[in-house]
Amino acid sequence: MTEEGYPLEAIILVTTKLGELWKVAEEAKKIEGVQFAKPVAGRFDVVVHAKTNRLSWVIARIHSIKGVANTESLITLEAKFE
């Protein structure tokens, strides 16, 4: 569980259809649990940061946005050093 009380924190990398990255980023920001969604340059078109206990639901909502082609999710890990 993260410090804020959410079970999962993830980075979701989104590939969009041509010309859709700005719209996809704006729509992704509206999803509950999304901390930010920003267009990026590189292999992916949008990076989404989410803190949620319903990651599958967040990913499904992202996929429901018109213009989304694919996603790849990275679950953050917490390392504890003593």
Where are the model-predicted features located?
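A compositional/biophysical signature of low hydrophobicity enriched in polar/charged and small residues
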Residues: 1-82
